[in-house]
Amino acid sequence: MGACMSKNDEETEQKKRSQKIDRDLEEDSKKLRKECKILLLGSGESGKSTIVKQMKIIHLKGYSDEELTNYRPTVYKNLLECAKAVVNAMHQFDIQPADPSLRPYVEFLQDYNMEGCPPGQSIDPKVGTAIQALWNDPAKEQLMERQTEFYLMDSAEYFFTEVMRIVAEDYRPNEMDVLRARTKTTGIYETRFKMGQLSIHMFDVGGQRSERKKWIHCFENVTSIIFCVALSEYDQVLLEESSQNRMMESLLLFDSVVNSRWFMRTSIILFLNKVDIFKQKLGRSPLGNYFPDYSGGNDVNKAAKYLLWRFNQVNRAHLNLYPHLTQATDTSNIRLVFAAVKETILNNALKDSGIL
C-alpha cells in the first residue's frame, strides 16, 4: 500500500515537473516572441540605409514595380549630382577633355537641371551621351588622381557605367539601382521583419552631425547595435566640415556610442563596409598617408585589421564586439553576414530575457 502511494506521489511529482518545464518553455517562447530592437548607427554615407534596403529585399519580398518606379527621380538626381561633381572638379583643377570636341558636353552638364520638370518626365538622353563621352575620355585618369580633393558619391562609377540604360525613355530602376541610390536619411526610419523565430524592429538613424541629437529616445532596451563604418572613407573629409577626416569622425562617433551609459549591456555588431571600394583605393591612396602608424602597405586584410584595431582601442567599456567585412550593395554578401548576425542577436535576446 505504502509502495503504491509512493509510486503515485512520484508520478504526480513528475507530472508537475513536466508541466513546469512546459510553462517555462512557453514563457521563454513568449519572451523571444517580443521584438528585438536593433539600432543602426554610423556616420553619414556609411551604408546604413543600404542595409535597410537589403532587409526589404531579403526578408520582405523586395520592391514592387511601383516602388521601383518611384525611385526614378532619385536615380536621376544622383546621376546629375555625380556628373556635376565631375565637371566642377574639372574646372577646379583646370582639367580639359583630351578630345576638344567634348568641351560643349562639360558646359551642357554644368547647366542642365531637372528642377521644375513634371514628376514623370524622363531625363534628356543627351545627358547620357555627354556623361559616357567624358567618362571614357583620358582626362578621367587625371581627375581620379585627385579624387581625395573633391566629393564624389561612391555610386558615381556605377551610374556612369549604366547611364544609357538610365536615360532611356522607358527606364524603370532595378533593385541594384535602388541599392546604389542615395537619399540623405533625416530623422528615424523604422522597419520590421522576421528573421527565423526573431521579430526584428530596426531603426535607421540619420548619420549627419545635425541628426545625432535625435537618437537618444531610441536607446532604451536595445538588443544589439549595428554600427556601420565605410572603410573607403579613410582618405575622405566630411560633407559638413571639410577639415575633418571621415574615418576619424567615425571613430569619435563609435567612441561616444560604445562607452555610453545607455549601452552597458549591449553588444555591438561592427560592419566594416564598402570593402570593395576600399580594396580599389588602397593602391592609389595609401592608408599610411592618413594613419602614419600603419605599415601594412596596400594589403586589404592588413589594412582592415588595422582599422578594426583602431575601433577596438576606443572600446573602453569592453563591450562584446562582432566585426564583419561587408559590401552593403551585394545582396549575397549581406545574406551571408546576416546569417551570422542572427546568432548574435538571438544570443543577446536570450540574455535580455533571462533565458541565458
From Swiss-Prot:
The keyword Flavoprotein does not apply. Residues 34-356 form the G-alpha domain. GO terms for molecular function: G protein-coupled receptor binding; G-protein beta/gamma-subunit complex binding; GTP binding; GTPase activity; metal ion binding. Disulfide bonds: none annotated. It holds the Pfam family G-alpha. One of its GO terms (biological process) is sporulation resulting in formation of a cellular spore. CDD domains: G-alpha. SUPFAM superfamilies: P-loop containing nucleoside triphosphate hydrolases (SSF52540), Transducin (alpha subunit), insertion domain (SSF47895). Belongs to the G-alpha family. G(q) subfamily. G proteins are composed of 3 units; alpha, beta and gamma. The alpha chain contains the guanine nucleotide binding site. This is Guanine nucleotide-binding protein alpha-3 subunit. It comes from Neurospora crassa (strain ATCC 24698 / 74-OR23-1A / CBS 708.71 / DSM 1257 / FGSC 987). The gene is gna-3.
